[in-house]
Swiss-Prot record:
GO terms for cellular component: mitochondrial matrix; mitochondrion; pyruvate dehydrogenase complex. This is Pyruvate dehydrogenase protein X component. It comes from the Eukaryota. It is found in: Mitochondrion matrix. The gene is PDHX. Delipoylated at Lys-97 by SIRT4, delipoylation decreases the PHD complex activity.
Length: 501
């Protein structure tokens, strides 16, 4: 950046500051830099252009969601040399949730695009571009050598052990000549050990030479009929004295295993039994990681009930006559929000030490997109009316499918709802979306004949429209008794739409 100073002082003082002697010329030209000292004026000035250039502003890969670790550059919206104002869209970044626009935080000129569009798996904190101030020579901006993310904090060094541990060499089991080493199934191994039989006395009939349970049972029958004798005990093999092994050899040393032909051969898609690897997007990888963590770390419990939608369908028809379009799913969201307001203990999460009740009722609604499942959030759903919920769901679902959700539109949430009724699914169980404690799985509504009584007590068959809902809950936060009471209240609220007003 060109920098200039105006100094209102005597030229002799400037000469001293610049290191000039009294006999030096008041003007000095060296390379592309120029100093000059004016004479006969009320002010003096000093100007430098090359030696005081500011460093460019770094544009780093930002963290656009709590679970984001990497990002993809989908498209650059500005070109090199183009002026940028604070708030202008610089580029589109695909996160683990959606495609988000990165806005500029400073005014200037986009000098360098360090990471081209289409680049994938860019770590957080990596340099993706450089910005300079207006008037700078943006064409000659140098790219820093270190463009990667900052290194993690150094861990305290652990002193090496005083002596190398001695690892005994594993003794290889020698097989007598003429014997074949079979691969035993667990059941077959148990039977052979129980009856003191040797697999070499029989024949392996399993796939790829596996000695199966049936093969072991045949040996037992032959032994019982006297057609085979028990194997003679062999002399114990001499053992080798313990000797130290290098770490790599110690890690790979094991008993020999029979050679098994591979099930598939990568790289040959036309060969039977092979596969084609499908590249996973950031969203797919994060979904897989979070689902695995959820099922392996959260104790899931399930509770199921049926709800009669007769009153909801009637109320929906009445609203349509007034040109108010709401779906059955909007009624379900509203019923869940009202129930959470009545039972705030369910509107909670587990923070590692205990349950934490959440202040706002924010409903996450699962939306299927080409990039995977994403859950936009209906903020403060208990305070919204049916029409507001319907409008929010439509707008957020469209943005989710277009990949235009903002981070604040899918982050957070205190309770999730996943509805597969439109796909003809009667009922299912869903995986909890951490750190939330519950998710409600909703199936399709279906006609069912039920035996009821009229006002006079006479039995009669009536057709009812039922849906099955299953709540998955974190047992650390919502126990079975609390989950049961929640579903009872949810059912009562949904079957009586007037309670939702």
């Amino acid at each position: 950046m060109a920098a200039s100073w105006r100094l209102g002082c005597d030229p002799r003082l400037l000469r001293c500051l610049l290191g000039f002697g009294s006999r030096r010329s008041p003007e000095l030209v060296k390379g592309a830099a120029r100093w000059s000292v004016g004479r006969g004026a009320s002010w003096r000035w000093f100007h430098s252009t090359q030696w005081l250039r500011a460093d460019p502003i770094k544009i780093l890969m930002p963290s656009l969601s709590p679970t984001m670790e990497e990002g993809n550059i989908v498209k650059w919206l500005k070109k090199e040399g183009e002026a940028v104002s604070a708030g202008d869209a610089l580029c589109e970044i695909e996160t683990d949730k959606a495609v988000v626009t990165l806005d500029a935080s400073d005014d200037g000129i986009l000098a360098k695009i360090v990471v081209a569009e289409g680049s994938k798996n860019i770590r957080l904190g990596s340099l993706i571009g450089l910005l300079v101030e207006e008037g700078e020579d943006w064409k000659h901006v140098e790219i820093p050598k270190d463009t990667g993310p900052p290194p993690p904090a150094a861990k305290p060094s652990v002193p090496p052990p005083s002596a190398e541990p001695q690892i005994a060499t594993p003794v290889k089991k020698e097989h007598p000549p003429g014997k074949v080493q079979f691969r035993l199934s667990p059941a077959a191994r148990n039977i052979l050990e129980k009856h003191a039989l040797d697999a070499n006395q029989g024949t392996a009939t399993g796939p790829r030479g596996i000695f199966t349970k049936e093969d072991a049972l045949k040996l037992v029958q032959l032994k019982q009929t006297g057609k085979i004798t028990e194997p003679r005990p062999t002399a114990a093999l001499p053992t080798t004295p313990a000797a130290p092994l290098p770490p790599q050899a110690a890690a790979t040393a094991s008993y020999p295993r029979p050679m098994i032909p591979p099930v598939s051969t990568p790289g040959q898609p036309n060969v039977e039994g092979t596969f084609t690897e499908i590249p996973a997007s950031n969203i797919r990888r994060v979904i897989a990681k979070r689902l695995t963590e959820s099922k392996s770390t959260i104790p899931h419990a399930y509770a199921t009930t049926d709800c009669d939608l007769g009153a909801v369908l009637t109320a929906r028809q009445n609203l349509v006559r007034d040109d108010i379009k709401v779906s059955v799913n909007d009624f379900i969201i509203k019923a869940a929000a009202v129930t959470l307001k009545q039972m705030p203990n369910v509107n909670a999460s587990w923070d590692g030490e205990g349950a934490k009740q959440l202040p706002s009722i924010d409903i996450s609604v699962a939306v299927a997109t080409d990039r995977g499942l994403i859950t936009p959030v209906i903020k403060d759903a208990a305070a919204k009316g049916l029409q507001e919920i319907a409008d929010s769901v439509k707008a957020l679902s469209k943005k989710a499918r277009d990949g235009k959700l903002l981070p604040e539109e899918y982050q957070g949430g205190s309770f999730s709802i996943s509805n597969l009724g439109m796909f003809g699914i009667d009922e299912f169980t869903a995986v909890i979306n951490p750190p939330q404690a519950c998710i409600l799985a909703v199936g399709r509504f279906r006609p069912v004949l039920k035996l009821t009584q009229d006002e006079e007590g006479n039995a009669q068959l009536q057709q009812r429209q039922l849906i099955t809902v299953t709540m998955s809950s974190d047992s650390r936060v919502v126990d079975d008794e609390l989950a049961t009471r929640f579903l009872e209240s949810f059912k009562a609220n949904l079957e009586n739409p007037l309670r939702l007003a």
